[in-house]
């Protein structure tokens, strides 16, 4: 299968691509800055196309001939425009997939219940899933909780704070409960999802344990052999 991957320069995309290659797929990586992929061990095994999801014409050219695609990009910028950019990018990608006659789009969104107060970024990620699924190409949307793995932003934060500060004054969100999931599990699910058939669907994925960020930092400190950390939410 010929697969278009956006976000190949990112944390998950850079780990997903070699798994797809190993599975026998022909991979096309769309990157705004292709040079970021130079030197990676799998660079010679893939086709790299310079492009941007906000460029509708270039995106359609990159998608032509592809059977399926991964949408692994979203804006983390601040300001009022990020949601509009996310919306436009998703619409461009939906249209490019439809024009190419793709079998499936796999999108990694964020876990959060519908109908509740969501952060602007999480609400935008849900909206992106809806925009992608509004076209002709079926979409598998994986909504993941906090992804834990070496190098992930979540893990680095959970590690760095206990490593540096024996006493921490933290925001109240450290008491927010979530279902952390290992990056290896997310990658396995992404690889499996490209083989989905049938209609669009949303799949919520998380690990077996429900923990607060405070509890996760305490677990890390214990596993790392650090003295018990005092965490004071304010």
Language model features: what each stretch is:
Residues 89, 153-154, 173-194, 201-204, ...:
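Substrate-positioning beta->alpha
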Residues 2, 193-234:
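Mid/C-terminal beta-alpha module of Rossmann-like enzyme folds, strongest
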Residues 1-25:
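N-terminal Rossmann NAD(P)H-binding glycine-rich loop of SDR-like oxidoreductase domains
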Residues 35-100, 110-115:
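NAD(P)H-binding glycine-rich loop region in Rossmannoid oxidoreductase-like domains
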Residues 109, 130-153, 157-164, 169-172:
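Conserved beta-loop-beta element that borders a ligand/cofactor-binding pocket
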Residues 6, 30, 72-73, 105-110, ...:
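SDR active-site strand-loop-helix element
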Residues 25-32:
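Conserved glycine-rich Rossmann-like NAD(P)H-binding loop of the short-chain dehydrogenase/reductase
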Residues 83-87, 117-129, 133, 147-148, ...:
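Short-chain dehydrogenase/reductase
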């Amino acid at each position: 299968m010929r697969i278009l991957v956006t976000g190949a320069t990112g944390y998950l995309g850079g780990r997903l691509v070699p798994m797809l290659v190993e599975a026998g797929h022909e991979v096309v990586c769309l990157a705004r800055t292709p040079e970021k992929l130079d030197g990676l061990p799998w660079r010679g095994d893939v086709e790299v196309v310079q492009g941007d999801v906000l460029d509708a014409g270039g995106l359609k050219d990159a998608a032509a001939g592809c059977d399926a695609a991964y949408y692994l990009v979203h804006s983390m910028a601040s300001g009022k425009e990020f949601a509009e950019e996310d919306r436009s990018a998703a619409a461009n990608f939906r249209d490019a997939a439809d024009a190419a006659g793709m079998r499936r789009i796999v999108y990694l969104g964020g876990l959060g219940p519908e109908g509740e107060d969501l952060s602007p970024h999480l609400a935008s990620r849900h909206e992106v899933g809806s925009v992608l699924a509004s076209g002709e190409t079926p979409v598998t949307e994986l909504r993941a909780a906090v992804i834990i793995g070496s190098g992930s932003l979540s893990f680095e934060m959970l590690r760095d704070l206990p490593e540096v500060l024996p006493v921490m004054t933290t925001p109240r969100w450290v008491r927010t409960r979530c279902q952390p999931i290992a990056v290896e599990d997310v990658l396995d699910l992404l690889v499996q999802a490209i083989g989905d058939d049938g209609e669009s669907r949303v799949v919520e994925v998380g690990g077996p344990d429900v923990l607060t960020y405070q509890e996760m930092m305490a677990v890390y400190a214990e596993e790392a052999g650090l003295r018990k950390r005092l965490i004071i939410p304010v």
